[in-house]
Amino acid sequence: IRCFITPDVTSQACPDGHVCYTKMWCDNFCGMRGKRVDLGCAATCPKVKPGVNIKCCSRDNCNPFPTRKRS
């Protein structure tokens, strides 16, 4: 499987059986910059703390950097 990986947001090969993930959360600059985003791959979908959103998927490049909605 190939997943996008931060910080460069490049597509990289991950080991067989791994999943891609997109993890998003707010920090002190959330109001100005939007949510922080971490892209990667892992053996299983990572467990996250409350307030952190995570989406896992198992297709090539299924975790692109999310686009920010314009108001």
Swiss-Prot record:
<feature type="disulfide bond">
    <location>
        <begin position="45"/>
        <end position="56"/>
    </location>
</feature>
<keyword id="KW-0528">Neurotoxin</keyword>
<dbReference type="Pfam" id="PF21947">
    <property type="entry name" value="Toxin_cobra-type"/>
</dbReference>
<dbReference type="GO" id="GO:0099106">
    <property type="term" value="F:ion channel regulator activity"/>
</dbReference>
<comment type="similarity">
    <text>Belongs to the three-finger toxin family. Long-chain subfamily. Type II alpha-neurotoxin sub-subfamily.</text>
</comment>
<dbReference type="InterPro" id="IPR003571">
    <property type="entry name" value="Snake_3FTx"/>
</dbReference>
<keyword id="KW-0008">Acetylcholine receptor inhibiting toxin</keyword>
<keyword id="KW-0800">Toxin</keyword>
<keyword id="KW-1015">Disulfide bond</keyword>
<keyword id="KW-0872">Ion channel impairing toxin</keyword>
<dbReference type="InterPro" id="IPR045860">
    <property type="entry name" value="Snake_toxin-like_sf"/>
</dbReference>
<dbReference type="GO" id="GO:0005576">
    <property type="term" value="C:extracellular region"/>
</dbReference>
<dbReference type="GO" id="GO:0030550">
    <property type="term" value="F:acetylcholine receptor inhibitor activity"/>
</dbReference>
<keyword id="KW-0964">Secreted</keyword>
<dbReference type="InterPro" id="IPR054131">
    <property type="entry name" value="Toxin_cobra-type"/>
</dbReference>
<feature type="disulfide bond">
    <location>
        <begin position="14"/>
        <end position="41"/>
    </location>
</feature>
<feature type="disulfide bond">
    <location>
        <begin position="57"/>
        <end position="62"/>
    </location>
</feature>
<keyword id="KW-0629">Postsynaptic neurotoxin</keyword>
<feature type="disulfide bond">
    <location>
        <begin position="3"/>
        <end position="20"/>
    </location>
</feature>
<feature type="disulfide bond">
    <location>
        <begin position="26"/>
        <end position="30"/>
    </location>
</feature>
<protein>
    <recommendedName>
        <fullName>Long neurotoxin 1</fullName>
    </recommendedName>
</protein>
<dbReference type="InterPro" id="IPR018354">
    <property type="entry name" value="Snake_toxin_con_site"/>
</dbReference>
<comment type="function">
    <text>Binds with high affinity to muscular (alpha-1/CHRNA1) and neuronal (alpha-7/CHRNA7) nicotinic acetylcholine receptor (nAChR) and inhibits acetylcholine from binding to the receptor, thereby impairing neuromuscular and neuronal transmission.</text>
</comment>
<dbReference type="GO" id="GO:0090729">
    <property type="term" value="F:toxin activity"/>
</dbReference>
